[in-house]
């Protein structure tokens, strides 16, 4: 707060210090926003994508609506949050045996994430997979909206797909139990 005063900032809004332990991940910020700004936040907000953009994305990524289109969020913010490539390969194997599918592989440019991506793309299922690491979030979000399912590590892609209204399975590795 001292820096804020020197900077001429009149009001500072923050969570109480040293009280994060045992805070509920969504109820605490909702309460904070309600008290400080008199705004009510919905429990289940959804990100909307313009229909024209969604249709252009279908063409751009050659999405076939006769197939089951699945986002696989294979990246992660840290090595302990990332599920090994072999697990995703097993998922692709099992699902592709019973359904006609296409898998979109969402990850960042981090070298460890790229290893997972390369392992999947060098598997026998590479023809079913489309890497998304060269695309921006602006390009990827309409693609996610066109997916039937999302299976992701506990990453931004799991949160985005859920917020876009896509059925989402989040794979939890090293995540605190409070979440």
Label the model's feature ranges.
Residues 1-179:
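Catalytic machinery of carbohydrate-active enzymes
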């Amino acid at each position: 707060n001292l820096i804020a005063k020197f900077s001429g900032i009149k009001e500072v809004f923050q969570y109480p210090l040293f009280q994060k332990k045992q805070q509920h991940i969504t109820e605490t910020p909702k309460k904070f926003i309600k008290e400080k700004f008199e705004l009510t936040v919905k429990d289940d907000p959804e990100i909307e994508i313009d229909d024209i953009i969604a249709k252009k994305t279908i063409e751009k990524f050659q999405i076939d609506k006769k197939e089951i289109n699945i986002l696989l969020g294979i990246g992660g913010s840290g090595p302990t949050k990332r599920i090994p490539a072999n697990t995703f390969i097993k998922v692709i194997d099992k699902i592709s045996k019973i359904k006609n599918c296409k898998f979109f592989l969402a990850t960042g440019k981090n070298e460890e994430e790229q290893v997972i991506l390369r392992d999947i793309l060098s598997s026998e299922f590479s023809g079913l997979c489309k890497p998304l690491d060269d695309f921006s979030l602006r390009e990827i979000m309409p693609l996610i909206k066109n997916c039937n399912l999302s299976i992701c590590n506990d990453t931004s892609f799991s949160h985005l797909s859920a917020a876009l209204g896509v059925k989402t399975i989040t794979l939890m590795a090293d995540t605190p139990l409070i979440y």
